[in-house]
Amino acid sequence: SIKGETYYVYSKFVKAEGAASSGDDSSTEESTQETSNVGEGKLICIDAGHQATPNTDTEPVGPGAEDKKAKVSAGNTGVTTGTEEYELNLEVALKLQSALEARGYTVKMIRTSNDVDISNAARAELANSDKADAFIRIHANGSTDTNASGVMTVCQTKDNPYNADIYDS
């Protein structure tokens, strides 16, 4: 649990057996969670989106693209909590790192500090240069719609104009 909220991850790469922990750090009971070694050394690259200081210089939105956007935007701030998105993203990413490593995965973190300057393109290049089996980008998007809730997952498709050729690989 993070700040009293529960989040779930679905992945063909994650398998747990036994009773799950409530995630409540205040509990004195030991977790009976047992994990298998499903990761078998697969490399997972985790990017905690954003950073303490945005970089408004621009870069292409994708490989070979003419359209450009800021290298790293500021992200959002929690309306209720006041937590900056880059802080929450790193907190979630570090918990995911621990969970994946406990399951036998090798994990590369794009950042382990908020005080970095790593562009979006550089983040993808780091995952690609290490030939990661999966690249997970953690974000906590916001909305001006007060009725909006839930989660969003974005994944590679064969229709991606920048890298559709790797869809089946």
What role is predicted for each listed range?
Residues 30-38:
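A short, basic/flexible loop-to-alpha-helix module at the beginning of a structural domain
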Residues 2-31:
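Boundary regions of SH3-family modules and the immediately adjacent low-complexity/disordered segments
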Residues 4-6, 39-41, 131-133, 148:
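Extracytoplasmic
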Residues 3-5, 12-14, 47-51, 112-113, ...:
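Solvent-exposed coil/turn segments that connect beta secondary-structure elements
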Residues 80-169:
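Active-site-proximal helix/loop segments of hydrolytic enzymes
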Residues 10, 55-59, 147-149:
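Short, solvent-exposed loop/turn and secondary-structure capping segments
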Residues 37-112, 134:
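N-terminal catalytic or cofactor-binding beta/alpha core of small enzyme domains
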Residues 16, 21, 53, 160-161:
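A broad, structure-centric signal for solvent-exposed, well-ordered loop/edge residues
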